[in-house]
């Protein structure tokens, strides 16, 4: 594997982990600033090597999946996020891109508003009556929070006024004013309850209560900033006009909204808001800048995960100085050993900060960090900050070097660092308690075996009490044994046992993904399952045969081959099957027997489609005998190029591969 491939894999794994913590668990471990840094690094690397972009990369999607504790609502119109800029130069570059795409030399009229630091929600009104509400979730599916949203007094249960559409889905931010946040924490300290780190966490925790009566006691509020569904009615043709119409119908809208007719006016708005930020009474982390004209918005369109006509201009992260008192080492699912700085506690932007990730040995070397050093900590709205630099001019005399362990701090196994990789790994595998915990958490996760109710804390206890050593042990658990865990009553224990029983019926692709084979994400697992059809065929495959699977190269093929060559892994798989884990037998499709122009061809989709979603297109292509790959190579037979097709199209043309557009694809699908 090339070094850049390893960097991309590690970055994507890290970002997905933090997206899960932020969007699903409402328990972020890093700051927005650190997440943004990682995302920028990933974008920059993918820009260098667009052929390595994967469909499941965090740059290609929004956010993370919802919890199953709530019912789920599928967004009819996806809830996209915004791209970010962090300085004036980046904003001016964004402004120029917009003007260039519009082929205009005239200034764009921008609508500027506050970037609230709360929880994004959608609220659906039918004939003016509130009928449902949902969180953003993963942008496609969110959690049904209707009962809780109905308790927020700022949100009208019925719109008032004239010309209300038959169906109107408004989008906005639920947040907690500073005074309400302080009162919640004051009450929590007095009663021994949970003290929240910041207003955003408090708002998320309040809104996602299973008991709406608790939500009703929290002083949440709401500002509307956009629209999703619009049926049976009309709205003004400008963004500001729509906000004013929402206000006329009784929906709360921020009064800090301004039209700006030049880039300089936008910058002035940004700096004025930044200056007033401490006195607003609620948290913001930047300003949002949108093209005011809806016609121009439509002309500009979207990229994969964000509109081209809007951007979030984020404030600089806030910084403080403190001392590194120690460095500890944590072990992840794949054995990656991550150094964590233990800091002299310091208040940064209203939050007491006591630790920060140092990523890897290369980062420590880059910083020139030693234990005892005075460092600059940067934080911008999250819980765990980043170490920006070392204050060498104030280095104490008693500092000492940070020594990476030669043995795993958890299990004592040897550690290794493969040449060209940034990560040091424990070689202990499942004998390592830390890896065992993380592997089991991955195994039961929603996108893997999807065991409802089997949370991280339960896994931690099961491993620590030595009830569970391998995934197969999970299916041997009884309600009686689970009842002995902390905060686990008989009913909850039985629910977990029932969920485990339900999870036994899965798919071959989910099962492969759940095994946690290194470098095998959901897309690769699906490709392996589709290509080989059966577990027996996959286990018997050679490295050369594995490389025939679309998107599987020598590195992934080697990891898969080595995994199945390991006797202990085969033993665990045998135990899982013996415990009743199963999936439907494969439906064998002979491409030669399918009367379709796509039969037997390896197809790559690139660019955005306007007539159907990418997932729908993939499903229809596969049904017609095609193999859909994520990157263009000599194995590719056909490339389907949608709007704004980029490097994949260029590579296809370079290799002389047949290229068709979306209209031709639709014609052939109907052939």
From Swiss-Prot:
Recorded catalytic activity of this chain's protein: NAD(+) + (deoxyribonucleotide)n-3'-hydroxyl + 5'-phospho-(deoxyribonucleotide)m = (deoxyribonucleotide)n+m + AMP + beta-nicotinamide D-nucleotide
Taxonomic superkingdom: Bacteria
Binding locations of Zn(2+): 408, 411, 426, 432
SUPFAM superfamilies to which the protein is assigned, alphabetical: BRCT domain, DNA ligase/mRNA capping enzyme, catalytic domain, Nucleic acid-binding proteins, RuvA domain 2-like
GO biological process, one term: DNA replication
GO molecular function annotations of the record: DNA binding; DNA ligase (NAD+) activity; metal ion binding
Entry keywords, A to Z: DNA damage, DNA repair, DNA replication, Ligase, Magnesium, Manganese, Metal-binding, NAD, Zinc
InterPro entries hit by this protein: BRCT_dom, BRCT_dom_sf, DisA/LigA_HHH, DNA_ligase, DNA_ligase_AS, DNA_ligase_CS, DNAligase_adenylation, DNAligase_N
Positions that bind NAD(+): 32-36, 81-82, 113, 136, 173, 290, 314
GO cellular component: cytosol
Active site: 115
Residue ranges occupied by any BRCT domain in the UniProt entry: 593-671
Enzyme Commission no: 6.5.1.2
Needed cofactors: Mg(2+); Mn(2+)
Pfam entry (one): DNA_ligase_ZBD
NCBIfam families: dnlj, PRK07956.1
Homology family: Belongs to the NAD-dependent DNA ligase family. LigA subfamily.
Protein's job: DNA ligase that catalyzes the formation of phosphodiester linkages between 5'-phosphoryl and 3'-hydroxyl groups in double-stranded DNA using NAD as a coenzyme and as the energy source for the reaction. It is essential for DNA replication and repair of damaged DNA.
Protein name: DNA ligase
Organism expressing this protein natively: Salmonella typhi
């Amino acid at each position: 594997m090339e070094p850049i491939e390893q960097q991309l894999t590690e970055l994507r794994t890290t970002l997905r982990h933090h997206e899960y913590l932020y969007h699903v668990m409402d328990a972020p471990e890093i700051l927005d600033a650190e997440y943004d840094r990682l995302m920028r690094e990933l974008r920059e690397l993918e820009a260098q090597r667009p052929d390595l972009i994967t469909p499941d990369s965090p740059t290609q999607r929004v956010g993370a999946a919802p919890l199953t504790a709530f019912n789920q609502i599928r967004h009819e119109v996806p809830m996209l996020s915004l791209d970010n800029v962090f300085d004036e130069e980046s904003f001016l570059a964004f402004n120029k891109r917009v003007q260039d795409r519009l082929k205009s030399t005239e200034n764009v009229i921008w609508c500027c508003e506050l970037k609230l630091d709360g929880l994004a929600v959608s609220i659906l009104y039918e004939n003016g009556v509130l009928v449902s509400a949902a969180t953003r979730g993963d942008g496609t599916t969110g959690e049904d929070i209707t009962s809780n949203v109905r308790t927020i007094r700022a949100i009208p249960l019925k719109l008032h006024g004239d010309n209300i559409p038959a169906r109107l889905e408004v989008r906005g931010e639920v947040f907690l004013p500073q005074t309400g946040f302080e009162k919640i924490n004051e009450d929590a300290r007095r009663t021994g309850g949970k003290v929240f780190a910041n207003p955003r966490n408090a708002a998320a925790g309040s809104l996602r209560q299973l008991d709406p009566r608790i939500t009703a006691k929290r002083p949440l509020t709401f500002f509307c900033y956009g629209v999703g569904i619009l049926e049976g009615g009309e709205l003004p043709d400008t963004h500001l006009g729509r906000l004013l119409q929402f206000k006329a119908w009784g929906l709360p809208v921020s009064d800090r909204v301004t039209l700006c007719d030049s880039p300089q006016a936008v910058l002035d708005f940004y700096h004025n808001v930044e200056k007033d930020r401490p006195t607003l009474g609620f948290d913001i982390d930047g300003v949002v800048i949108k093209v005011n004209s809806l016609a121009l918005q439509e002309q500009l369109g979207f990229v994969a995960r964000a509109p081209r006509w809007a951007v979030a201009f984020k404030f600089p992260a806030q910084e403080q100085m403190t001392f590194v008192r120690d460095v500890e080492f944590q072990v992840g699912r794949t054995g990656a050993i991550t150094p964590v700085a233990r800091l002299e506690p310091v208040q940064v932007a209203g939050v007491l900060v006591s630790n920060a990730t140092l990523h890897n040995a290369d980062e420590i070397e880059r910083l020139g960090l030693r234990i005892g050093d005075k460092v600059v900590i940067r934080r911008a709205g999250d819980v765990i900050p980043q170490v920006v630099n070392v204050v060498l001019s104030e280095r104490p005399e008693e500092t000492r070097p940070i020594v990476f362990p030669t043995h795993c701090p958890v299990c004592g196994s040897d550690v290794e660092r493969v040449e060209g990789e940034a990560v040091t790994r424990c070689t202990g595998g499942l004998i390592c308690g830390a890896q065992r915990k993380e592997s089991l958490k991955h195994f039961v996760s929603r996108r893997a075996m999807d065991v409802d109710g089997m949370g991280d804390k339960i896994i931690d206890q099961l491993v620590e009490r030595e009830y569970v050593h391998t995934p197969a042990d999970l299916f041997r658990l009884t309600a009686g044994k689970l009842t002995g865990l902390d905060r686990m009553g008989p009913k909850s224990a039985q629910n977990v046992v029932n969920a485990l029983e339900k999870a036994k019926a899965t798919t071959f692709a989910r099962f492969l993904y759940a095994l946690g084979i290194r470098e095998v994400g959901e897309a690769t697992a699906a490709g392996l399952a589709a290509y080989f059809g059966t577990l027996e065929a996959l286990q018997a495959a050679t490295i050369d045969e594995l490389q025939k699977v679309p998107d599987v190269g020598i590195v992934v093929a080697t990891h898969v081959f080595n995994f199945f060559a390991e006797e202990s892994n085969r033993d665990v798989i045998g135990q899982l099957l013996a415990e009743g884990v199963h999936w439907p037998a494969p439906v064998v499709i002979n491409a030669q027997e399918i009367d379709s122009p796509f039969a037997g061809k390896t197809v790559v989709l690139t660019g955005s489609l306007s007539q159907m979603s990418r997932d729908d297109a993939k499903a229809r292509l596969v049904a017609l005998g095609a193999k859909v790959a994520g990157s263009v190579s000599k194995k590719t037979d056909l490339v389907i190029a949608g709007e704004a097709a980029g490097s994949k199209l260029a590579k296809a043309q370079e290799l002389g591969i047949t290229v068709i557009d979306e209209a031709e694809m639709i014609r052939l699908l109907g052939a």
